């Protein structure tokens, strides 16, 4: 009887305590996290993924993430990470909502994350340098192959190792894939693996790169979401994907970033000389008129590097015209129609002069143009980062020959992690300036061979100007940049 009373007492106590809880309170139940006010996207640096330059932010994943944020009605907060491990940790800890970093689907990733719908497809290819032996079999890669740790390439090689037992490779977590590709071009490595799109983009300014064996074909590139508690976001992502696919946005972005790169043809000196005869006579009067205190031939060389003297030129980042101005820069310079050669050349000349004037006084007069052109390409902030790196290495930050040595370091994590403005394609800026200098030297040589007659503005240019300068830039059929 006593034991029964104790049991009844305990039950009564529990009921009383339960009744004292606030209505609706569930003890120890996990509370859902409040929805973030921004769309937090983790990414990696890369030309086709996410990058900052003198022309602003760009990249397939960046543009699509911005559109997804707009679809959700939230600001985009895009955070680049140094490597995949940090990126995956951030997603696991809830520091970001999703990963958009040009990452391919793979068995291991399917076990760890939820996969978004396919954005585009790539091949996994062997990369080697022109002049080196092209690998003809998997076995020839052994001992000569270096890949990025935690990459899908490691999974591919591990599977191949089951049937090619002698296959071996090195892994690195200190360098990203673009760095390994650059090491192939410089002859520091024999072989690496790359996505076909990445190889095509890098080959535009490292033409010695060659594509070898294809190890995987048409692998989907996807966004990654957390394995748990991501149903709502996945549902919205799928709806967004279907909407943009129907609207043609995905096809447009694929063409914008990848459709043109395979057709890239490295411009040699003979092609440039042909352009001097065929195109330059129409635009030379404009270069001479707006160059002012600049050498018009440097302005013309920069324009050729930017647009091949095509007034309707357009880059994957949305810059347009003879001098490839951004919308923001054009607005600041009073350029209402970037397709008007006169306005574009005037705007480009004014912008170059402004960059020259903003450079430190310690830079010699005869080198200021090369520094300004580098800033035109990647931005003044990244240029200042390179100058600081040069000084830290005991080099002269006001000498172009020294700064061009360290600009490619802005692509290496070890160095860009120490800078204020972070990653930049410094090697591309060096190639950009070097190309302009070669074009300039050729222009000087050609100009010295010809009579110094003052050419008149051709009638067809005047007609174009009358039509173009009377109104704003005409709209295009492409989706909004």
UniProtKB/Swiss-Prot annotation:
Region called Disordered, residue ranges: 450-481
Catalytic activity, as annotated: Exolytic cleavage of the (1->4)-beta-glycosidic linkage between N-acetylmuramic acid (MurNAc) and N-acetylglucosamine (GlcNAc) residues in peptidoglycan, from either the reducing or the non-reducing ends of the peptidoglycan chains, with concomitant formation of a 1,6-anhydrobond in the MurNAc residue
Residues covered by region (Non-LT domain): 20-261
GO biological process terms, semicolon-separated: cell wall macromolecule catabolic process; cell wall organization; peptidoglycan catabolic process
Segments for region (LT domain): 262-481
Single GO MF annotation: peptidoglycan lytic transglycosylase activity
Entry comment, domain topic: The N-terminal domain does not have lytic activity and probably modulates enzymatic activity. The C-terminal domain is the catalytic active domain.
HAMAP family: MltF (MF_02016)
Task performed by this protein: Murein-degrading enzyme that degrades murein glycan strands and insoluble, high-molecular weight murein sacculi, with the concomitant formation of a 1,6-anhydromuramoyl product. Lytic transglycosylases (LTs) play an integral role in the metabolism of the peptidoglycan (PG) sacculus. Their lytic action creates space within the PG sacculus to allow for its expansion as well as for the insertion of various structures such as secretion systems and flagella.
Official protein name in the record: Membrane-bound lytic murein transglycosylase F
Lineage of origin: Bacteria, Pseudomonadati, Pseudomonadota, Gammaproteobacteria, Alteromonadales
């Amino acid at each position: 009887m006593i034991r029964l009373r104790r049991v009844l007492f305990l039950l009564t106590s529990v009921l009383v305590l339960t009744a004292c809880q606030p209505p609706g309170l569930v003890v120890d139940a996990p509370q859902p996290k409040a929805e973030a006010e921004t769309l937090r996207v983790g990414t990696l640096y890369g030309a086709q993924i996410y990058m900052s330059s003198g022309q602003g932010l760009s990249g397939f994943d960046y543009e699509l993430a911005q559109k997804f944020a707009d679809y959700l009605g939230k600001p985009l907060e895009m955070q680049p990470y140094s490597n995949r491990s940090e990126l995956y940790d951030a997603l696991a800890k809830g520091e970001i909502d999703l990963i958009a970093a040009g990452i391919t689907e793979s068995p291991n990733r399917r076990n760890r994350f939820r996969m978004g719908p396919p954005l585009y497809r790539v091949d996994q290819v062997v990369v080697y340098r022109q002049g080196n032996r092209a690998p003809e079999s998997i076995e020839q890669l052994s001992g000569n192959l270096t890949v990025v740790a935690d990459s899908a390439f490691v999974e591919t090689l591990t599977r191949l190792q089951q049937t090619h037992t002698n296959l071996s490779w090195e892994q690195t977590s200190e360098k990203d894939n673009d760095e390994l590709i650059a090491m192939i071009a410089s002859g520091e490595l024999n072989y690496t693996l790359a996505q076909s799109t990445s190889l095509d983009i890098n080959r535009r300014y490292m033409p010695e790169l060659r594509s070898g064996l294809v190890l995987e074909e048409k692998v989907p590139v996807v966004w990654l979401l957390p394995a748990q508690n991501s149903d709502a976001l996945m549902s919205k992502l799928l709806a967004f994907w279907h909407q943009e696919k129907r609207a043609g946005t995905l096809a447009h972005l694929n063409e914008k970033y990848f459709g043109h790169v395979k057709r890239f043809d490295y411009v040699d000196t003979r092609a440039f000389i042909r352009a001097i005869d065929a195109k330059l006579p129409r635009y030379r009067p404009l270069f001479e008129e707006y160059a002012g205190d600049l050498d018009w031939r440097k302005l013309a060389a920069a324009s050729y590097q930017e647009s091949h003297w095509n007034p309707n030129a357009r880059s994957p980042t949305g810059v347009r015209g003879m001098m490839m101005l951004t919308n923001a820069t054009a607005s600041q310079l009073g350029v209402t129609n970037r397709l008007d050669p006169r306005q574009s050349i005037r705007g480009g000349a004014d912008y170059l002069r402004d960059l020259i004037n903003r450079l430190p006084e310690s830079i010699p007069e005869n080198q200021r143009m090369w520094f300004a052109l580098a800033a035109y390409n990647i931005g003044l902030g990244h240029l200042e980062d390179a100058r600081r790196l040069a000084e830290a290495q005991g080099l002269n930050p006001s000498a172009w020959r020294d700064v061009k040595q360290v600009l490619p370091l802005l692509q290496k994590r070890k160095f860009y992690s120490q800078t204020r403005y972070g990653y930049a394609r410094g090697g591309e800026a060096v190639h950009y300036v070097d190309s302009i200098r070669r074009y300039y030297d050729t222009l000087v040589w050609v100009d010295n061979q010809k009579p110094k007659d003052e050419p008149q503005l051709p009638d067809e240019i005047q007609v174009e100007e009358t039509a173009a300068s009377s109104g704003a830039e005409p709209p295009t059929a492409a989706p909004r940049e």
